[in-house]
Structure formats: C-alpha cells, structure tokens
Amino acid sequence: DYILIDCMPSLGMMTINALVASDTVLIPVQAAYLPVKGLQQLIRTISMVKKRLNRKLTIHGILLTMVDFRTNYAKDIASRVRETYGSKISIFENVIPLSVKVAEASAEGKVFIVIVQMEKYLWLMKI
C-alpha cells in the first residue's frame, strides 16, 4: 500500500514533517529552469532529513512534469536533469506532458490520471 503526501513546492515545516514521516520520496519536477534549479536544494534537504531525522528515507525517483516536447527548451531541460542526476537518482522515462486539461482539473479541484499507453485522460472527482 502507498500513501501519497502531496506537499507544496517549498521547504517549510510541513514538507520537513512529510519527509520525516515517509519511507520514500517521488520528486515531480516541472520542465523549466527555476524548478530544476530548486531540485538541488530539495535533494540537499532530503539528504539532511535522512542523516538527522529519518535514516530509512530514500528517493524513489524524479518525474518530469509539464513537459512540452514540441520545444527544444523542454528537451534541453529533460536532458539536463538526466545528465545531472541520472547516475544517482532514477529518472522516470515516462513524463507528464504539458496539458491545459491538467490545469483545468486542478482549478476545478479534480484529480486526474494520465494513461500514457492510451494517450487519453481519465478524470475522477476528488473525494
């Protein structure tokens, strides 16, 4: 069984508490310069939490999100993440593509599941 703790993109007390309570971390990273730059600080924070507060904490992998492979920029960012972190941390081959449907679902408080093989979206109401 898995319990997902979805944290805000900050390194505040709530995120630290979530890391202390977790066994593993899945790191979603938006395919853009600033989120990738913040990834380094997050990895340092995870390392600090592991060293001082939660020795069993591991990084499950990095998942690229909001990827628009029509642009060279997104390809460059994805490549940079793989080159920089790929030897130390698993980088998922599948990505979450840039989609207005995802933004609309978030604004409406809905949960979404991307089924990559079928290239369709399955929408679920948030409970």
What do these predicted ranges mean?
Residues Y2-P97:
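Conserved catalytic-core segment of NTP-binding enzymes
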Residues A105-K126:
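C-terminal boundary of histidine-terminating zinc-finger modules
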